Amino acid sequence: PALGFARRAKMIIDEYLAFLLTFVLVIPFERLWMPADRLSKGKQPILLVHGYGCSRGVWWLLRRRLEAAGHTVASVSLAPPHISLGRLEPILSQRIEAVCAATGSPQVTLIGHSMGGLIARCYLARHGNERVARLITLASPHMGSDMSRIGFGQNSREMTTGSLWLQDMAAEPLTVPTISLRNAYDNYVMPQDNQRLPGAQDIELP
């Protein structure tokens, strides 16, 4: 449904403020917001995978809420930030192994935001589902985004609608239960329907 002027203006302002908060206060001072992961044994951990141009610091609030709910939460920073998606995947792979070793859990739940959801799918395509119980993606450009044309780096080009990388990934079947959370008014994944992932449980957030 179409948004009225007031709601659209509020949405744009809220996104702009969130952008400033993330890149001016959160990421540059990540260590203040995100101390080392607290990995205790006995529970299957959640591993948070950030999106394009970000770091693990963007998860500071969600991590607090998940830990308050009793979950064991891990995170990863994918760097350098603008290399190929395929070259970022081994960083996630190494982190999954480290988290499983630290917690004693044979598997993790992956939550990937934006590009992080694509990296998670790349991991599953390369390594299978032995270490992953389920996948949740948040506003991931599964079919690409026209906005990626103005981004920097090889990973941005690979996230462009219709890229060969995305076509290759689309040919890979989902091997774990997957939920794709999306928003019909996303200002970064355009067209917004490109957040849909065939084979996943599709949930549109208000």
Model regions: which residues?
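Flexible, membrane-associating and regulatory peripheral segments of lipid-active enzymes
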Residues: 1-46, 60
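Short intrinsically disordered, low-complexity coil segments enriched in acidic
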Residues: 2-4, 117, 206
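Short amphipathic alpha-helical patches
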Residues: 36, 40, 76, 89-90, ...
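Feature targets compositionally biased, intrinsically disordered low-complexity regions
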Residues: 41, 103, 198-199
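Serine-dependent carboxylesterase/thioesterase catalytic core
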Residues: 48-52, 56-57, 61, 65-175, ...
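C-terminal catalytic-base region of ester-bond hydrolases, centering on the histidine
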Residues: 173-206
